[in-house]
Design a protein with these regions (language model features):
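Cytosolic regulatory regions built on CNB/CRP/Popeye-like sensor folds
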Residues: 1-172
C-alpha cells in the first residue's frame, strides 16, 4: 500500500490473494488444485490460531466453518450419554478438520478440541458451498478431496474397531 492511502490498489489486492493462494497450495489437502480455484478458496479463508484446550465445535451444532491444519493437533470427540466425552481421533498438520459443513443438515458429527496450540486456515463454509455450486469443477474438486478424507478415516475407524473387538474381555 502507498504511504498516503490506506486503501490497497487493485495490484496489491491481487498480490494478497496470490500470496494466500500460494500458501493454500502448500497444504496437502489442496495439493495440485488450480491456481484459479485456490484464489477462489483463499477469498473465503483466514489464518487462525487456537490455544491448547480450546473447543472448536460441539457435536450436533451447526457446521459453519472448516479448517486446514498447518500445525498442532486437534482431538475429535463424541459425547456418550452416561460416559462423557470419548476421544475418537487426532487430526494434525496437513489434514482437513471438518466435513459436516459440506452435507445437509450441516451439523457436526463429532466435537473437536485443540490438543496443542493450533495454526490453521479457517474457511467460511457457506461461502465455499456457494462457490462450489457456482463452479461445478471446483465443487467436484472439493467434494473429491473431502471424500478421500472420509474414506481414509472410515478405514482407520474400521481398523480400530477390529483391534478393540479382538482384545480379550477385561483388557479394554
Amino acid at each position: 500500500m502507498t504511504s498516503q492511502s490506506t486503501t490497497p490498489t487493485t495490484q496489491e489486492v491481487i498480490l494478497l490473494i496470490e500470496v494466500t493462494a500460494v500458501a493454500l497450495a502448500a497444504h496437502p489437502f489442496l495439493h495440485g488444485m488450480s491456481h484459479g480455484h485456490l484464489a477462489v478458496l483463499a477469498d473465503a479463508a483466514s489464518d487462525v490460531t487456537f490455544p491448547a484446550k480450546h473447543r472448536l465445535f460441539e457435536d450436533d451444532h451447526g457446521a459453519t466453518r472448516f479448517w486446514l491444519i498447518q500445525s498442532g493437533h486437534v482431538t475429535l470427540d463424541l459425547h456418550v450419554p452416561g460416559r462423557g466425552r470419548m476421544n475418537i481421533e487426532s487430526i494434525g498438520m496437513g489434514e482437513l478438520l471438518g466435513w459436516s459443513w459440506l452435507f445437509p443438515p450441516y451439523k457436526w458429527a463429532f466435537g473437536a478440541v485443540a490438543a496443542s496450540p493450533v495454526e490453521a486456515f479457517e474457511f467460511d463454509a457457506r461461502t465455499v458451498r456457494a462457490r462450489c455450486a457456482a463452479d461445478p469443477v471446483l465443487g467436484y474438486e472439493v467434494t473429491r478431496r473431502v471424500a478421500r478424507v472420509l474414506s481414509k478415516r472410515l478405514q482407520s475407524t474400521r481398523v480400530r474397531l477390529i483391534t478393540v473387538s479382538i482384545q480379550p474381555v477385561g483388557v479394554r
